[in-house]
Amino acid sequence: MLTFIRRVAVATTLLVFLPFVVSAQDFVWTPGLQRAFSDLQKLKVAPAQQQMARESTANGIRIFLDDYADMLLLATSDDEQAFDRLSDRESDRLDVLKKLDDTSPWQRVMLAEVRLHWAFVKLKFGKEVSASWDVIRAYKLLAENQKRFPNFLPTYKSLGTLHVMIGSVPDNYIWVANLLGLHGNIKQGQDELKGAGQDPVFGREARLIDFMVRAYVLKFTDADEKLLQRFISEHPDNLLLNFFGATIEQKNGHSEQALAYLANRPTGKDYLALPIIENILGDISLQKGEYPSAITHFQQFLATYKGQNFLKDTYYKLFLCYWLGDDRSAGDIASRAYLQKVITVGRTTVESDKAAHKFADTYLKRGASPNQKVLMRARLASDGGFTDSALTYLRPYSEAKFPLTPEKAEYNYRMGRIFQRRNDSDAAIPYLSRALTLSEPDQLSFGATAALQLGYIYKQKNDRTHARSFFQKAISFKRHEYKNSVDNKARAALNE
């Protein structure tokens, strides 16, 4: 009798817990897959793939990590042939994941992650419509998972990111997002990313995304910079963190710190090649006026990069090296060939390529005045945070020395940004205000960017009325080459 009872008890236990056993079998973070994920997050793709090859191909976590590896390879190389060869894997992996245990909180997260991997890759290859549908479907999967498993932290890494993106949508388009079933705001997304930062699996990635949101959507503060430095120092063997740390610092006018991250980045055969690093190093040399060094870096980038993005931008910067490095007419002639190349190579998917193409088209048709060299040197130095050099270039000049309205607007904008970077907002305001006034009639990009910076200045002064007015003014500018990034930042500031 006791034996019978024991058997019934065992059978009952198995029936009760069988769904959890199946779930565990479908989505298992084995020690090997944990090591592989850690390696992938460091851009050590080959060692991760070797580790994954020892794991079951039926494991949903293995499928996710295989996809993660493909995403990293495609995103860092921009290789069109590789994209054509690998793109069918998205639907194959989704089909397999859909058949796995849908009572597991991991199933919808893994489906969403695969879709978001390919959305990111497709955007880089100019497939915007397909990428958009992947994002929409990923959002719905994550929203459903949140309802079913509200305390499951891995959901919130990507859901929080999407809520930030939705919160950046302009007011006159929010109805489209709502019609598609997309809801969320920036504060909600940031809170979710903060929560996901505590997750043992996705925590590191969530923290990195939060830094990128602060840098590319919001306003990156000195406090953010200190937290970023500490975060990167805690992971000295992580190439991905060093790379993104460098791009964030460069974006925010701290090129010396960006250079420090790249100089201290981990290297070796285990790490994925990043040709774009040569481009960043070239940028920093160009900002410093070290033209031979910049040329070497840009040429190395072109020799190793297989994609179509950043080509226009790189040839434009090679033009700048020769144009700014030789004030004689011979320098103008020698540099012209690089601008002609800008027109014929690459594509205009990214903003830097759009700006390069616009400059090349204008210069080749109309030429450039000597004053534009001065403004360009000041711009490059200021963008890198080398404000002493930037002021040295512009101090001998005043607005009156620039005959053309676009030059007058740019002079004022550059002076305003220099003082803003030197934490002298009171000195910056008159210059930025003048740049805005000069830019409005012709809708010059300097007006939009000046309005954005004035919004930030008044926000810092806690003058919300003026800040809001300037953010709205920034959005009102039409058809300039930086509209996407300016509008996103202005909308984000308005929605905070």
Regions found by a protein language model. Give the residues of each.
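"A position-specific structural signal for the A-helix of alpha-solenoid helical repeats
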Residues: Q34, L65, A69-L72, M110, ...
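Alpha-helical repeat scaffolds
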Residues: P47-R54, F83-K98, S130-A143, G181-G195, ...
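Alpha-helical adaptor scaffolds
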Residues: L208-Y216, T247-K251, L375-G385, K401-G447
